[in-house]
């Protein structure tokens, strides 16, 4: 049963005194929205739920009128630290080997499409956790290739290939009917 409840993380006595003064005549910035990340592991687990339970949960989370009304979703380009496995969309050297992987096709895309059917105005932001390992070097002063998921830097010799990697990824999601609002390097 999905119900809303108030959660008290501490009593008022435990909080330091705080005053927030709002002046509606002064505006410093605007809030564009709030959101959530969905990862391969998240989507895998959501797909283990009964379809009606999953749809109810996603509605409570993403619907403008029946839920929190999140306005953004962040997804990973390739694997993240919450993926089922380590991969990029181009693990074999050469950008011509680019392809969406099973985690994206089997888990992320179906959940993302279900979320967008609930709230089609959600903006999708994508960020890579890592570039393909064949694009990595130990450091920008030591261009020794580095076979690592978590360390290293992008070899300047592969800047164009990495840009193409981003473009191919956006195009692959567009081909699945998913518009990407923004990508961010990491």
Model-derived regions, located:
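N-terminal catalytic cores of secreted or lumenal carbohydrate-active enzymes
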Residues: 2-180
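Short, conserved phosphate-binding/catalytic loop or strand-edge motifs used
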Residues: 185-186
């Amino acid at each position: 049963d999905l119900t809303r409840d108030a959660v008290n993380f501490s009593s008022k006595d435990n909080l330091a005194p705080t005053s927030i003064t709002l002046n509606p005549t002064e505006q410093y910035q605007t809030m564009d929205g709030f959101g959530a990340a969905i990862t391969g592991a998240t989507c895998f687990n959501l797909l283990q739920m009964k379809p009606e339970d999953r749809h109810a949960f996603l509605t409570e989370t993403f619907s403008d009128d029946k839920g929190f009304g999140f306005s953004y979703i962040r997804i990973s380009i390739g694997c993240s630290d919450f993926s089922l496995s380590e991969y990029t969309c181009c693990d074999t050297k050469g950008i011509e080997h680019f392809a969406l992987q099973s985690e994206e096709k089997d888990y992320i895309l179906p959940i993302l499409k279900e979320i967008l059917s609930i709230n089609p105005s959600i903006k999708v932001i994508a960020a890579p956790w890592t570039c393909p390992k064949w694009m990595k070097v130990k450091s920008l002063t030591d261009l020794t290739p580095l076979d690592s998921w978590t360390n290293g830097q992008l070899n300047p010799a592969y800047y164009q290939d990495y840009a193409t990697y981003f473009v191919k990824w956006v195009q692959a999601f567009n081909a699945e009917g998913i518009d990407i609002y923004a990508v961010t390097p990491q």
